[in-house]
Amino acid sequence: MEVKELERDKNRVVLEYVFNREEVLEAEDKAARYLNQRVEIPGFRKGRVPKNILKMRLGEDFQEYTLDFLMDLIPDTLKDRNLIMSPVVTEREIKEDTARFVVEVHEEPEVKIGDVSKIEVEKVDEEKVLEKYVERRLEDLREKHALLEPKEGPAEVGDLVRISMEVYNEEGKNLTTREYEYVIKEGEDRPFVKDLIGKKKDDVVEIEREYEGKKYTYRLKVQEVYRRTLPEIGDELARTVNNEFETLEQLKEELKKEGKDIYDVEMKESMREQLLEKLPEVVEIEISERTLDLLVQETINRLKREGRYDQIVSSYESEEKLKEELKKRILDDIKRDRAIEVIAKERNVDVSDEELEKEAEELAPFWGISPERAKSLVKSRRDLREDLRWAILKRKVLDLLLEEVTVKVVEPRGEGDGDERKGDN
């Protein structure tokens, strides 16, 4: 086999493969053995048809099988090339005693990463977020520790109503009976709950609903109406929440720590997402238009196989507009992935087996399995292991880059005009 580079366009390389007579004959032998097990030629026993008879009877079909077996030899020659997609065979033929293939290979494109400090990510003002969090949690605790007093009068805003709900079908059969408690809120519009306003103990409300063409009757009986008295925000509330607290300030401090833990996790994730979204802005890439066009067509073919293409293309002015959008997204995705890979290599960022195990343990509850089972799965399944390794690597690289980006502190949503900037850091 001889391999020659015919053409290079950035990451796209066109290679010519030429197989000699011995290699072609060997591939013909493989094709003959393969076909002997699958075709029947009149006058010959199955599996006993001579190669020359198969060549004569099958003609071009035999040649195609021979070319297929030769094609199987090509991937091994590409192992040292990092390919972004499968090789594309543009020509293949057997001429006289040799076979010739022309193959397009699309390597991972080279990237150059610019000044990451030009990327701006937003960070919501920590003090204001925690202040709002503490206020909200204190209100939650007031609600949780409300004093309940049965009342004779009708249910009104702020009251808690305990009901039994019976559901009947069209034939009058009782399908279920359950008890519920609802707190009636200002501007109440929840189904059933709004129908309880003004009702007293022992009152009955019947409501008809239709689901999937069937009618159901809901019979709500008011078991009890309670007037709720919310405790004042003060030292007494703190002691009620936890007898280890003596003062409101101690409770607030604990709530602030609780909020800080949530804030740190959610804000770090938000900043990672912002950075990842903007990373392509500082990445220069050497990629062939042919590569992008093939990847776009590959995506369109997949959407068609999944039956989603018509719905998606209908949201664009034309197929060309869809292709433009897909091309941009694919290019940005390649920039992101290549940048992560290059930075990880340059800065010696790696993922250890211990980190993989820890990640598996943390994901186990979401997978609905035990931590030990999760770790075993990661060890036994290479695809899962590589997916996790990439997720961890990407997170570690982004965290490194977050130390270099420009961070803009902004007001929490709903605070001021929602866009006010506090400054840079």
UniProtKB/Swiss-Prot annotation:
**EC number(s)?**
5.2.1.8
- Write the lineage as a comma-separated list: Bacteria, Thermotogati, Thermotogota, Thermotogae, Thermotogales
- Domain text: Consists of 3 domains; the N-terminus binds the ribosome, the middle domain has PPIase activity, while the C-terminus has intrinsic chaperone activity on its own.
Question: Enzyme group, top EC level?
Answer: isomerase
Q: What is the official name of this protein in its record?
A: Trigger factor
The gene behind this protein is tig
Fetch the InterPro entries from UniProt. Answer: GreA/GreB_C_sf, Trig_fac, Trigger_fac_C, Trigger_fac_C_sf, Trigger_fac_ribosome-bd_bac, Trigger_fac_ribosome-bd_sf, Trigger_fact/SurA_dom_sf
**Does the UniProt entry include the keyword Membrane?**
no
Keywords for the protein's UniProt record, in alphabetical order: Cell cycle, Cell division, Chaperone, Cytoplasm, Isomerase, Rotamase
User: Which positions are tagged coiled coil?
Assistant: none
Q: What is its biological role?
A: Involved in protein export. Acts as a chaperone by maintaining the newly synthesized protein in an open conformation. Functions as a peptidyl-prolyl cis-trans isomerase.
Residue span(s) of domain PPIase FKBP-type? 158-231
Which GO BP terms apply? cell division; protein folding; protein transport; regulation of DNA-templated transcription elongation
